[in-house]
């Protein structure tokens, strides 16, 4: 047996296959029994009857033999299964005596083992998770906080070893009337591994007062490979309590993207989304968290996008939370790294929708676009303003470009104001010495007063001024265009008349040069395209062949934005769809960016459906960038304000440039109508770019899926579900990239059920050390919390599994039935190298009438040949701890029995040696006596005796 080699996993798989085969054979035998054991005679004669009886007897004999074979098959499968378990137990028993002395030495001197996972903190104690082994080991999960008047803080996750993931932070304790406990911070990874997810903040049971706990910060990624941890979601509340703020995402490693910020908790005022984590040296900043839903006040502000690493792009700002009164503002996009070449600042987050048909409401303002790096790169696009039943939200300003080369970011479109005024378009960003000013955003439409267009950015040295945004339907005024650069360039649309004779001469000469190109090809050589004239439904004009921005599409008709200049230039924003009584009116698609450099335009907002049963228009798709540049943000879905209407879906984000640039974020699903619109999918990344984040869903709707990463890019983050909606799935990584994080589900507030978290995306097949995306957290609810999403699988050979999402908290309903959501299963590690993801913690049950039931913890994933299996979630932790403790006592007892047996054997051997020496002395004495020589008296066994006294 010393040369026997067995793989328990292979034996278990073979047993499963054999069991399935046996079931199939049994089903086939049962189906054939009726037709073979009781044959009907072909005729009434004796011969036919005898033949039928003969064949029936054969069939019965076959069934009897089949039953015996089935019993043997079941015994064989049972023996195979038990044999695999015996081999696994033998392997564990053989390794433990060798490893225990080494680990005991390191534990005594450093407080952590050399190899092994850290212990999980016990639930309800807020204890920190233990650190993993110095060489190989995952950090333990922090224990959840204790419930009370004020919830206790969750424990921090333990740090991972050189190879291993950080532990997840514990969830904050539920408060009966005070402040929910803050979630614990996720543990940091060391070299190869993913940072742990931050714990969710604790909720509040009382219907008045209090505040939800803040989510914990995500852990930092490993220095070389691994994903940064996701920030924990803020605690949800009921009644007049405030939602908790989401935790910040962890920092990325050398090549990793920063972690996604946690979503804000739902409440009377929504909690702010957590900030995205900073990118690693070559990594992009993380996406900011989605603001929390508010039922009686302001929606939560979206989290700011994380700053890019030294050579990375900025992260996208989080979307503002929806509200029944006033939507939250979108988060600002993160700035690109100082030395980033061609990387853009992050796009600003979309403002949240606000209000109801009867009470009115205000849409949230879009977030500002992030700035580019120090020398090269374009500014990020501003976020679109949110829809308001009274006033639309203002569009966010575009970010500024690098000082030497790059175009300013486009301003976000103003939000639609149904009852009073549309939102003002955002201002375009400032370009570099060479580059075009950003276009101003279009004003939002309104039945009363349309919003004014945004101001175009001004050129610096060589480049066109940005076009002023078109005014919204309802007598909105066009924005002022930007002035061109000092040496070369045309003024933007609606630019003020110049008083400089030199500038006037320059403009006239360029107009003469552009005339034949405009006549023959429909676009100038140098200059921006012309905005569509209101009332014509015309698409925006394309930018110049050399450089120029595409124009914005005509508002109110869903016209597409114009393409950017053929070489350099940003695409124009699509116009919003028309207001109608029944039929859908899709928003216009954003224009494509230039071939070399340029950002795609943002998609237009879908039209509003006012009639009964009307369907809001889908948001327009964001424009794509061709070589270097970012894709545009998808347009928001149109609202349906009539009876039994359906909200429009958000538009898909534009794809990033082939080489560099960020993919666009999907648009928001519409808030109005039942069902509401789902969020748009994020755009796909380019060669080195990450996929775009999915858009947030409308009220009770699911978030959009994250886009897939490029060849070396990370998958995009799934969009957050709103209220009861499920989170979107994270995008898959490129061939050499990591998987995206699943979106968080919306919190149910005072509702009954809630959605589950999105599943994490899988890492690319050939990525080295990349992690699967973490599953999204399940939403909190008054009764049953939503299930956490499953973590994505690591790369095929070398990679780490993503952590499962935490289950949502069960809230405070007037019933004793409380059930926390189940934690998501951890992802599998690579086949050869990599630790598996930890299962998500089950959500806590809380109740005004008594203690609820905690959710089941998720299963840990399977590790590779070199790596650790993932820890189970918190619900299973205590049983597992007891089992491990019993195993330690058993091993200690076995060791003591072996030592006693060895001592007995040693004493027996000593007695045998004494007897042999005594026999040898007797034989010598006898020989001497025969020879007539005197005998020597010796002591035998301590007794002085003569030869005559010998037996």
From Swiss-Prot:
GO CC annotations on file: cell outer membrane; cell surface; extracellular region
Keywords: Cell outer membrane, Cell wall, Membrane, Repeat, Secreted, Virulence
Domain of life of the native organism: Bacteria
Compartments it resides in: Cell outer membrane; Secreted; Secreted, Cell wall; Cell surface
Database matches in Pfam families: PE
Region (Disordered): 887-951
Ranges annotated as biased composition (Basic residues): 887-919
Residue ranges constituting the PE domain according to the UniProt record: 4-94
Family: Belongs to the mycobacterial PE family. PGRS subfamily.
Known role: The arginine-rich C-terminal region protrudes from the mycobacterial membrane and mediates M.tuberculosis entry into host epithelial cells. May serve as a bridge between mycobacteria and host cells by interacting with specific host phospholipids and extracting them from host cells, for their direct integration or as a source of phosphate, during phases of TB pathogenesis when M.tuberculosis is short of phosphate supply.
Name this protein carries in UniProt: PE-PGRS family protein PE_PGRS3
Organism listed in the record: Mycobacterium tuberculosis (strain CDC 1551 / Oshkosh)
Lineage, uppermost ranks: Bacteria, Bacillati, Actinomycetota, Actinomycetes, Mycobacteriales
Gene: PE_PGRS3
């Amino acid at each position: 047996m010393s040369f026997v080699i067995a793989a328990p996993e292979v034996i278990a798989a073979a047993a499963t296959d054999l069991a399935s085969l046996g079931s199939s054979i049994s089903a086939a035998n049962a189906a054939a029994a009726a037709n073979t054991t009781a044959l009907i005679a072909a005729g009434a004669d004796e011969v036919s009857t005898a033949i039928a009886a003969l064949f029936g007897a054969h069939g019965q004999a076959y069934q009897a033999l089949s039953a015996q074979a089935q019993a043997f098959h079941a015994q064989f499968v049972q023996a195979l299964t038990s044999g695999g378990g015996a081999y696994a137990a033998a392997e564990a028993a053989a390794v433990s005596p060798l490893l225990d002395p080494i680990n005991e030495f390191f534990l005594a001197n450093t407080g952590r083992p050399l190899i092994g996972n850290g212990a999980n903190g016990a639930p309800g104690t807020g204890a920190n998770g233990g650190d993993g082994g110095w060489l190989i080991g995952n950090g333990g999960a922090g224990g959840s906080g204790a419930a009370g008047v004020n919830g206790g803080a969750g424990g921090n996750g333990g740090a991972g070893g050189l190879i291993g993931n950080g532990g997840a932070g514990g969830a904050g304790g539920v408060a009966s009337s005070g402040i929910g406990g803050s979630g614990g911070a996720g543990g940091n990874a060391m070299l190869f591994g993913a940072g742990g997810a931050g714990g969710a903040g604790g909720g509040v049971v009382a219907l008045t007062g209090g505040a939800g706990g803040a989510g914990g910060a995500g852990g930092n990624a490993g220095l070389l490979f691994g994903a940064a941890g996701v920030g924990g979601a803020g605690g949800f509340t009921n009644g007049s309590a405030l939602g908790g703020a989401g935790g910040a995402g962890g920092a990325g490693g050398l090549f990793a993207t920063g972690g996604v910020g946690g979503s804000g908790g739902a409440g009377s005022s929504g909690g702010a989304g957590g900030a995205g984590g900073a990118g690693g040296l070559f990594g992009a900043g993380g996406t900011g968290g989605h603001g929390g839903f508010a039922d009686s006040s302001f929606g939560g502000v979206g989290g700011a996008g994380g700053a890019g690493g030294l050579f990375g792009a900025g992260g996208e700002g989080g979307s503002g939370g929806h509200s029944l009164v006033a939507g939250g503002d979108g988060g600002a996009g993160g700035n690109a790294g100082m030395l980033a070449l061609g990387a853009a600042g992050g796009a600003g987050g979309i403002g949240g929708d606000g209000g109801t048909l009867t009470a009115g409401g205000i849409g949230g303002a879009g977030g500002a676009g992030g700035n580019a790096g120090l020398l090269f790169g374009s500014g990020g696009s501003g976020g679109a303003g949110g829809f308001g039943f009274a006033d639309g939200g203002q569009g966010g300003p575009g970010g500024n470009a690098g000082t030497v080369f790059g175009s300013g970011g486009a301003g976000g479109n103003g939000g639609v104001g149904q009852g009073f005024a549309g939102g003002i378009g955002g201002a375009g960003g400032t370009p570099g010495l060479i580059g075009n000013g950003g276009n101003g955003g279009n004003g939002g439409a309104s039945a009363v007063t349309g919003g004014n267009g945004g101001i175009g950015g001004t050129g610096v040295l060589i480049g066109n001024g940005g076009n002023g945004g078109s005014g919204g339907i309802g007598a909105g005024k066009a924005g002022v265009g930007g002035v061109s650069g000092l040496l070369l360039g045309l003024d933007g649309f609606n630019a003020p008349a110049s008083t400089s004779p030199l500038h006037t001469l320059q403009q006239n000469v360029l107009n003469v040069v552009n005339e034949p190109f405009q006549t023959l090809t429909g676009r100038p050589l140098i200059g921006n395209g012309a905005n569509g004239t209101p009332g014509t439904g015309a698409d925006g004009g394309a930018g110049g062949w050399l450089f120029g921005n595409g124009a914005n599409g005509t508002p109110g008709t869903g016209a597409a934005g114009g393409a950017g200049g053929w070489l350099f230039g940003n695409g124009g924003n699509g116009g919003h769809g028309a207001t109608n009584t029944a039929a859908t009116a899709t928003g216009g698609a954003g224009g494509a960016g230039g071939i070399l450099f340029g950002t795609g335009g943002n998609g237009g907002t879908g039209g509003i459906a006012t009639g009964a049963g009307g369907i809001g228009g889908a948001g327009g798709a964001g424009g794509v960038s061709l070589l270097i540049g970012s894709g545009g943000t998808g347009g928001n879905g149109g609202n349906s304000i009539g009876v039994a209407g359906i909200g429009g879906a958000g538009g898909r984000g534009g794809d990033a440039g082939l080489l560099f640039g960020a993919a666009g974020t999907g648009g928001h699903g519409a808030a109005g109508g039942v069902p509401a619109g789902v969020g748009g999918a994020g755009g796909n990344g380019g060669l080195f770019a990450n996929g775009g984040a999915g858009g947030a869903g409308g009220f009770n709707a699911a978030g959009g899926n994250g886009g897939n990463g490029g060849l070396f890019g990370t998958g995009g983050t799934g969009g957050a579900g709103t209220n009861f909606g499920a989170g979107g799935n994270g995008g898959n990584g490129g061939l050499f990239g990591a998987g995206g994080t699943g979106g968080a589900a919306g919190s149910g507030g005072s509702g009954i059920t809630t959605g589950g978290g999105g599943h994490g995306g899988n890492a690319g097949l050939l990525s080295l050390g990349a992690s699967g995306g973490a599953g999204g957290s399940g939403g909190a609810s008054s009764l049953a919390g939503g299930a956490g999403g499953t973590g994505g699988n690591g790369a095929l050979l070398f990679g780490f599994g993503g952590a499962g999402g935490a289950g949502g908290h069960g809230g405070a309903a007037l019933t004793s039935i409380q059930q926390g959501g189940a934690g998501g299963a951890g992802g599998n590690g690579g086949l050869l190298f990599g630790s598996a993801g930890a299962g998500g913690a089950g959500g806590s049950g809380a109740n005004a009438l008594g203690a609820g039931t905690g959710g089941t913890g998720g299963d840990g994933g399977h590790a590779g040949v070199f790596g650790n299996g993932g820890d189970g979630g918190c619900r299973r932790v205590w049983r597992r701890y007891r089992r491990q403790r019993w195993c330690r006592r058993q091993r200690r007892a076995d060791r003591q029995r072996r030592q006693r047996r060895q001592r007995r054997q040693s004493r027996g051997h000593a007695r045998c040696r004494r007897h042999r020496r005594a026999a040898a002395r007797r034989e010598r004495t006898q020989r001497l006596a025969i020879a007539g020589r005197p005998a020597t008296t010796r002591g035998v066994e301590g007794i002085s005796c003569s030869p005559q006294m010998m037996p």
